[in-house]
Amino acid sequence: MSETPAQSSIKQERISYTPPESPVASHRSSTPLHVHTVPRALRMEEDSIHLPTHLRLQPIYWSRDDVAQWLKWAENEFSLRPIESNKFEMNGKALLLLTKEDFRYRSPHSGDVLYELLQHILKQRKSRMLFSPFFPPGDSIHTKPEVLLHQNHDEDNCVQRTPRTPAESVHHNPPTIELLHRPRSPITTNHRPSPDPEQQRPQRSPLDNMSRRLSPVEKAQGPRLQQENNHQETYPLSVSPVENNHCLPSSPWQESTRVIQLMPSPIMHPLILNPRHSHSVDFKQSRHSEDGMNREGKPINLSHREDLAYLNHIMVSMSPPEEHAMPIGRIADCRLLWDYVYQLLSDSRYENFIRWEDKESKIFRIVDPNGLARLWGNHKNRTNMTYEKMSRALRHYYKLNIIRKEPGQRLLFRFMKTPDEIMSGRTDRLEHLESQVLDEQTYQEDEPTIASPVGWPRGNLPTGTAGGVMEAGELGVAVKEETRE
């Protein structure tokens, strides 16, 4: 009879005994602890989730029917209350956008379990891809169970929550949409929780280097930090743009924000870096060394630490080429107008100004005369360039059989020779003629026509006829427009 009370006492002690959860247990919320949520979270962290075969794709690729089947499977697997599937009429991409509060709103009795289950499935899928020298298994994937002990059913707070591991960062990164969880506990140069020494492995990941830099004073501030975090239970959604094709670290005042970064796929795409690529990442505000320190030797704050975690799944800049900028018309080693026109015709950026009508026949059209004149003036550093002046320079080439205007067609021209033929045929004569006329007509740069000056005998003009004077004037203006640097 004496053994029965002893045995019952031992059993009672086994049931009532609970291991210490954290050094900050005294700062928990006054709300009673819901013990039934803890075993579920721990069980999902420790055990593998065996989904049906048709649900073993990444959740981002789930269809609406797959989401409904997943809800039905979870309801049976975990003995949950009936889940209204019409509250989750969405595909896998949309499902990943939901916060824990969204899950609770759609399913008040089972939303928290569904959310944790989804996170564990994502982590389990990604863990098969991340075991590499750059992703140590002990540091990158698994988290100690005691770190994940939930205090109550209504608040999404942890006793000592470590920053998001690379696995958690990666599974929120589909090809064109980027979800980034902010840690619940802000880690700045003034507030840092104490790291778990058991989590420091011989193999070091970028996150390990940060935790080793914490001072004893900073470790002692963990209880106060947890008390502050009890008031941060909402996680609003916000859209964060990408500036200059770099993933910008958020400010320390936005640690409770769940950020969704939308990025066009042709410019930026996610890439799991290996050691070869890890040294080529350029963050906008600071560049960090491998041990998690900035150039001044000070430990970096939360946003920079999250950047280091994001090295495991970084958005690599794929900057569009500079040619997509607005063309300014400057072309190197191009002095003459006919050559400049050829260069513009060969560049698709200038099709709004000038383009080929028939490339085989060398027929081209000036689409925007005034715009083309501005390009030519910019190339020659002439702000007062107009199409009237440029057209006189074009007419100069009529006489040399280089360019001809198409009869009866406005702004339609034809090259009579290829650039090689022009350069090899009459280049010397062209240079000599342009140089000679330039010397005689320098002072008449902006005159539309050339008239005989008072007191200047007609015989001293370049040619002896009035028509010759006009031709020489046109030639002089054309040459002046081209040769003035």
From Swiss-Prot:
UniProt subcellular location: Nucleus
Annotated Polar residues bias: 1-10
Covalent link Glycyl lysine isopeptide (Lys-Gly) (interchain with G-Cter in SUMO2), residues: 11, 284, 298, 399, 417
One GO cellular component term noted in the UniProt record for this chain: cytosol
Principal location: nucleus
Regions annotated as coiled coil: none
Chain positions found as N6-acetyllysine: 11, 298
Sequence positions bearing Phosphoserine: 22, 215, 240, 251, 319
GO BP field: cell differentiation; hematopoietic stem cell proliferation; mesenchymal cell apoptotic process; neurogenesis; positive regulation of transcription by RNA polymerase II; regulation of DNA-templated transcription; vitellogenesis
Phosphothreonine found at: 18, 165
Cleavable signal peptide: none
Annotated region described as Disordered, given as residue ranges: 1-32, 157-210, 440-485
Every PNT domain range: 41-125
DNA-binding region per Swiss-Prot/TrEMBL record: 335-416
Keywords on record: Acetylation, DNA-binding, Isopeptide bond, Nucleus, Phosphoprotein, Repressor, Transcription, Transcription regulation, Ubl conjugation
Family listed: Belongs to the ETS family.
Subunit text: Can form homodimers or heterodimers with TEL2 or FLI1. Interacts with L3MBTL1 and HDAC9.
Identification of the protein by name: Transcription factor ETV6
